[in-house]
Amino acid sequence: MNPVTVFFVVVVTVAACMILFQVYSIYLNYDNIKEFNAMHSPLEYSKMVNVTAIDRRIQDANDDIYDAKQKWRCVKLDDSYVSLSMFGYKSDGIGIRRFRTLNSCIDYTFSTSTHSSILNPCISPNDPKSRECTFLKSVL
């Protein structure tokens, strides 16, 4: 065997050993990895210093938004729930879309309504002193 072949055999062997060591290390620490993931799962959608933790497994309306006021949320307005952000309320085409339960609001906001109308009661021709506009400003 010439020196070049020996060199490549050594490099391939070292690379294979490194991969095997990494797999074995993951195998030994698997319980610790699961515990770490379980402990940090509440931070899955949060933004921390120099780190953005975004869940890319499921696409939702807040994935590409970093300003907290722009993020969509479901809040209780009178006897129903509404979906709102700084852009306004999710609309049903006529007025503010209202939901009877929090879960139905969450389901619509983060799965069904990727392209829905938005109603902002704080811009003209709407009244900026309306109850809906005041509520929107108070929530944000």
UniProtKB/Swiss-Prot annotation:
Contains two intramolecular disulfide bonds. They are created by the viral disulfide bond formation pathway, a poxvirus-specific pathway that operates on the cytoplasmic side of the MV membranes. InterPro entries: Poxvirus_A28. The keyword Metal-binding does not apply. One of its GO terms (cellular component) is virion membrane. Residues 22-140 are virion surface. Belongs to the poxviridae A28 protein family. Keywords: Disulfide bond, Fusion of virus membrane with host membrane, Late protein, Membrane, Signal-anchor, Transmembrane, Transmembrane helix, Viral envelope protein, Viral penetration into host cytoplasm, Virion, Virus entry into host cell. It comes from Rabbit fibroma virus (strain Kasza). It comes from the Viruses. Pfam families: Pox_A28. The chain crosses the membrane at residues 1-21. Coiled coil: none annotated. It is a single-pass type II membrane protein. This is Envelope protein A28 homolog. Envelope protein required for virus entry into host cell and for cell-cell fusion (syncytium formation). The lineage of its organism: Viruses, Varidnaviria, Bamfordvirae, Nucleocytoviricota, Pokkesviricetes. One of its GO terms (biological process) is membrane fusion involved in viral entry into host cell. It is found in: Virion membrane.
